[in-house]
Amino acid sequence: LSPFLLGSFDVDDNEVKANKLNRIGNIFVSDESYIALEKWHNDFLKDFCLKSRTIVPSEYIAEIGKKLSDKRSVLYWAAKNEVPIFCPGFVDGALGDHFFIFNEKRHADEKLIIDAAADLTKFYKLILEPKRIGAVILGGGIAKHHLIGAAILRDGLDYAIYISTGNEYDGSLSGAKPKEAVSWNKLKSSKNSVAIDAEATLVFPLLAHVWIHGS
């Protein structure tokens, strides 16, 4: 796929569009990259459907990871180490568009079925079975809520580290601090948790280095 380009927040978006680019903050993604992704994914879907019409999102993501060879990919390493990836927003964005278009071209008895409930069972077991559980949450949104919401069923996480640039003043879940989670039983106590107001891709690698190497 085409590489992403470093752009700017302060650009003329009509000009960006005229150049067949799409802006994500200060990152530009070309139309060609989306076209290439759709073609690759459509071919992958055709092969996948030869084995099963039912998609369990975490299993599907693992199969994609097995097809990748790029060692910079999170999906590649997760599949290699058999680490499940759960995506509550699985049908959002381009991926959802691909599923819709793919199904529109197929007969009723050939259409894909996305079994999100099967993933809920797997995910909740991972949350409920350990004696203690903690979370490192990068950013926020639906992924953060999916995790801490599930923790309500065990009276909350034991520990949490939030790394986010979000703020809490508009009721934002992404910006909500650990102490708010205590009121929902999403977190047992804010004393064993911390919120770091920082950009996660800058801070998390530094923390990971310390955890791995001890300094």
Segments from the language model and where they lie:
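Catalytic or ion-translocation cores adjacent to nucleophile or general acid/base/metal-coordination motifs
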Residues: 1-29, 158-175
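Conserved active-site and cofactor/substrate-binding residues in soluble primary-metabolism enzymes
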Residues: 19, 35, 39, 69, ...
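C-terminal functional extensions of proteins
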Residues: 132, 142-215
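Solvent-exposed alpha-helices and their adjacent loops that cap or buttress functional pockets
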Residues: 76-79, 105, 126-130, 152-155
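Active-site rim loops that border cofactor/substrate pockets in soluble metabolic enzymes
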Residues: 88-135
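General beta-strand structural signal in soluble alpha/beta enzymes
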Residues: 85-89, 138, 162
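Ligand-binding beta-strand-loop-alpha-helix segment within the catalytic cores
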Residues: 12-94
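Gly/Ser/Thr-rich loops at beta-strand to alpha-helix junctions
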Residues: 91-94, 139-145
